[in-house]
Amino acid sequence: MATVIKNGTVYQNGRLIKADVLIEGKKIKAIGTDLDAEKIIDAQGMLVSPGLVDVHVHYRDPGQTYKEDIKTGSEAAARGGFTTVGAMPNVTPVPNTPELMKKMVEENKHKGVVHIFQYGPITNDETTDIIPDYAALKKAGAFALSNDGHGVQTAQTMYLAMQKAKENNLIIATHAQDDSLFNKGIVNEGVAAKKLDLPPVTELAETTQIARDLLLAQKTGVHYHICHVSTKTSVELVRLAKARGINVTCEVAPHHILLTDSDIPKDNGYFKMNPPLRNKEDQAALLVGLLDGTIDLIATDHAPHAKSEKQGGMKNAAFGITGSETAFSTLYTKFVKEEKVLSLEQLLALLSDKPAKVFGIENAGVLEPGKNADVAIFDIEHKNEIKEADFKSKGVNTPFTGQKVYGETVMTLVDGEVVYQRGTK
């Protein structure tokens, strides 16, 4: 049965247009005016967007399914308007063999309600210097490589990894962190560390590893992608590298542009994340980086934890913040609706077509005839409160609970099928 989404404002190819979207089967059939079908979805006053693309999520499955699993994580993505995600490999066991990778890919397809692309690890268990068989992992379904949560500590290991990744046309996506400089820190070296008397994290833990890796990327020619850049110096390093022709891309997480360490009101585990919230100068530089193209995309780093793991103060709390269900609404409210730092078109590009393009994900992040019918419909005119009770994720570890925001997801379709609808369980 054909479906038409009528009366909405459609984001297509960088523009907002008044149009209808006709869906037949799993594909978009047409975008235009006065389209008709047996089933009509009225999007009057709504934004009709390509399904958003999040290249950085943690689903904890297998190994830590009390925090999240593929089903709940993908349902959370759908509730946030995301229809394509990249799942990090920090699960147990790490998918470091073709057999384990094939199993992960099959589980993602079977249990997930959105399209899930699976990362393979850069090193065998994400902390050793042993490099797995990238060719075999790619053949088994790995779409990129990452040790997210861990930096690759030795330059030699990263150099070899980049060479092998280049040979196999795989992206290296890194969590840039020198553990000797991170030194068991908790919050950014700044106001919160002093106020709360917590171990500080120097920005050098991030920036020195980025500088090292950029030189290695220049030598090898690999596509080097930096996860969740968080400092002014990181942005400057990437800007310089791009000017020199190094094949580098990077992402920023919503919380690093929405919050700073000055926003941490007390010793609250919901504000503990890695990289930590930085200062206002860093935040401003991240926004400039988004606007001038130094930062290529926004990715949530959705990192759910059990409530018990975020209680008892920041020293004992786990690192991480959920993001799938709050990203679009919080970003739209602050940067488009209120502060007018970004246009709606710019925000949507950073959350849809740009991440798909950077990672070479075909059929994602665009609304065009012949492409997958992956669509998100947002209510951008009315405010709604972020409530724990509404979350699909098992993790409610976010400091944004209680905020009133515009941009709630009304409906999400994947391959033409409704996978989320506001007001339904």
Swiss-Prot record:
It catalyses: (S)-dihydroorotate + H2O = N-carbamoyl-L-aspartate + H(+). GO terms for cellular component: cytoplasm. Keywords: Hydrolase, Metal-binding, Pyrimidine biosynthesis, Zinc. The active site is at D301. Substrate binds at H58, Y59, R60, N90, N274, H305, F319, G320. GO terms for biological process: 'de novo' UMP biosynthetic process; purine nucleobase catabolic process. Binds 2 Zn(2+) ions per subunit. One of its GO terms (molecular function) is dihydroorotase activity. Zn(2+) 1 binds at H56, H58, D148, D301. HAMAP family: PyrC_classI_B (MF_00220_B). Belongs to the metallo-dependent hydrolases superfamily. DHOase family. Class I DHOase subfamily. This is Dihydroorotase. It comes from Lactobacillus gasseri (strain ATCC 33323 / DSM 20243 / BCRC 14619 / CIP 102991 / JCM 1131 / KCTC 3163 / NCIMB 11718 / NCTC 13722 / AM63). The lineage of its organism: Bacteria, Bacillati, Bacillota, Bacilli, Lactobacillales.
